[in-house]
């Protein structure tokens, strides 16, 4: 029985890692042993930051809603409580979009919420 060598398999594995490491600085883009560490760390950062992005955007939406609501004499927590009492189910992403782009529609939502404070 002949010996099974893994030349093609390891070549493809190296090629895959080096392709992922394209654009890295120094030996991280050319040397397999360095590249594999950098690619693994990069994938860890990507995984972590996909979750952090959700957190960051929620904070951004809250800041935008708070700024827009303060122009109408309310604060964010009062506004969100009033929306719940008024049974208006609009998520923060849509509210922030309305606050930035459609002031008239946002103002009407604020007036409806003010009626339930």
From Swiss-Prot:
Keyword Acetylation: no
InterPro entries: Ribosomal_bL20, RIBOSOMAL_L20_CS, Ribosomal_protein_bL20_C
Molecular function GO labels: rRNA binding; structural constituent of ribosome
BP-aspect Gene Ontology terms: ribosomal large subunit assembly; translation
Presence of the UniProt keyword RNA-binding in the record: yes
UniProt keywords, alphabetically: Ribonucleoprotein, Ribosomal protein, RNA-binding, rRNA-binding
Pfam families: Ribosomal_L20
Alphabetized Gene3D superfamilies for the sequence: 6.10.160.10, Ribosomal protein L20 (1.10.1900.20)
Any Gene Ontology CC annotation: ribonucleoprotein complex
Domain of life: Bacteria
Family, as annotated: Belongs to the bacterial ribosomal protein bL20 family.
Function text: Binds directly to 23S ribosomal RNA and is necessary for the in vitro assembly process of the 50S ribosomal subunit. It is not involved in the protein synthesizing functions of that subunit.
Listed name of the protein: Large ribosomal subunit protein bL20
Lineage, broadest ranks: Bacteria, Pseudomonadati, Pseudomonadota, Alphaproteobacteria, Rickettsiales
